[in-house]
Amino acid sequence: MAKINFRPLHDRVVVKRIDAETKTKGGIIIPDSAKEKPQEGQVIAVGPGGRDETGKLTPIDVKVGDRVLFGKWSGTEIKLDGEELLIMKESDIMGVVG
């Protein structure tokens, strides 16, 4: 996992998509035009967390290196240092795999 030169703010998380399988279990190769974007990724960077009503910092539950699942339309796609990444709020993450 390459270190990126970007620090997200507040409760935002930077995620790199994990490539989907290019072949089905039955051996059929899926063309790029038929592939859906994967909804699984690896956390690359995390912000410090959000603040509650009293102003107290609430740290983020996920950490760098976690493998996460997120919604189909979650996050904003960016390109940073030649890598396609997603920036999303922690609340867009549905869970940690493994």
From Swiss-Prot:
SUPFAM superfamilies according to UniProt: GroES-like
Designated name of the protein: Co-chaperonin GroES 1
Source taxon at top rank: Bacteria
UniProt xrefs under NCBIfam families: PRK00364.1-2, PRK00364.1-5, PRK00364.2-2, PRK00364.2-4, PRK00364.2-5
Gene source species: Rhodopseudomonas palustris (strain ATCC BAA-98 / CGA009)
Homology family: Belongs to the GroES chaperonin family.
Main location class: cytoplasm
Pfam families xref list: Cpn10
